[in-house]
Amino acid sequence: MPDTAHTADTPVFMRDYRNAVDAQWRVTVPAPWRFAERAELFVRLKGDHLAVLPRSDVERFRRHADTLSGTDRTAVLTAWGSTTDQVKIDSAGRLTIPADWAQKVGIEKSSKVVLVGAIEHFQIWAEDRHATDESGLQKRGAALLAQYD
């Protein structure tokens, strides 16, 4: 779903940060990413991690869905909608993640997580799963990035 409709106001999430999930399923968002306090954010269950997306990603997906036929459009919107929830960053800079989804991706209360900047969105990984996945993802990303550097 390539989309070039990015502006100076489009959020940019960079770097990796480590943090802990508290007893209320909240994780502190890194200070450089807190501009998103003013933005609508959505959390999406992505198999082995959670993705936190700005509204622009949701709108991009909706434009893609609009290109599909009736039943395909309904199916893809249902699949997306059932794995996505709206979230907010509170005044203390914390994001509450859905407990059931957190547990599905290996995140428990008081456990360590890795927040991974992915430019257009950020990911929340259980620390141990991120360590397992990181080498493969980093190698693939480095190979693809070499085409642009």
Residue ranges with predicted function:
Residues 1-24, 32-87, 91-92, 99-149:
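Flexible "stalk/tail and boundary" regions
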